[in-house]
Amino acid sequence: MLITDTLSPQAFEEALRAKGAFYHIHHPYHIAMHNGEATREQIQGWVANRFYYQTTIPLKDAAIMANCPDAQTRRKWVQRILDHDGSHGEDGGIEAWLRLGEAVGLSRDDLLSERHVLPGVRFAVDAYLNFARRACWQEAACSSLTELFAPQIHQSRLDSWPQHYPWIKEEGYFYFRSRLSQANRDVEHGLALAKTYCDSAEKQNRMLEILQFKLDILWSMLDAMTMAYALQRPPYHTVTDKAAWHTTRLV
């Protein structure tokens, strides 16, 4: 949609929420996982590749804070970093994701080494981080508004995975449970920022485009996993059966 006249805050929120039609919960890869149709390799591949996204989130949030001159906003935003990195002796989301990896049969080194991260996933996640570093802090902050749709996807995993994949250990589900409340809290802050900052049709159109950019990132990650784990066409599959792609953060 193209906004020609500035929307009211409520109408703008409705436009943002309408973007949920493009959330990756509707991607065939995620639908297969939800319906119990994914193989062990596909579940493991998803967990290993999403870990790269998880470890990039605190870097993204630190970049937003570095560009934000408002102390009150920084005090609220820093909680996102603590949620993932942990604080006061408590483990955060990254540690919880490592336990998810172990619960699906991967070692911690499988995830920490990043050797399973597909180039398409790495490029998509790096694009998100680079945007957060270069955009104005308000736009970078509001790119996180895919959180509007996150509680549904976390709940769907909690509802469907235990019955479809009994081989996944129970302790692996802690991350999804913890994010149910954290995501709702983060949404309130992010929405308030978006509705305050986007006070013109131009800004509202741009913010919708930024939210679509973030949705594109999440969808593209699953496209890369589909090629590798569903269609059995990982990078360079026509010339080698080995993982020949780069496996480290180069910048």
UniProtKB/Swiss-Prot annotation:
It comes from the Bacteria. Keywords: Oxidoreductase, PQQ biosynthesis. GO terms for molecular function: pyrroloquinoline-quinone synthase activity. SUPFAM superfamilies: Heme oxygenase-like. It catalyses: 6-(2-amino-2-carboxyethyl)-7,8-dioxo-1,2,3,4,7,8-hexahydroquinoline-2,4-dicarboxylate + 3 O2 = pyrroloquinoline quinone + 2 H2O2 + 2 H2O + H(+). One of its GO terms (biological process) is sulfur compound metabolic process. Pathway: Cofactor biosynthesis; pyrroloquinoline quinone biosynthesis. It is an enzyme of class 1 (oxidoreductase). Its EC number is 1.3.3.11. Ring cyclization and eight-electron oxidation of 3a-(2-amino-2-carboxyethyl)-4,5-dioxo-4,5,6,7,8,9-hexahydroquinoline-7,9-dicarboxylic-acid to PQQ. Belongs to the PqqC family. PANTHER family: 4-AMINOBENZOATE SYNTHASE, PQQC-LIKE PROTEIN. This is Pyrroloquinoline-quinone synthase. It comes from Klebsiella pneumoniae (strain 342). The lineage of its organism: Bacteria, Pseudomonadati, Pseudomonadota, Gammaproteobacteria, Enterobacterales.
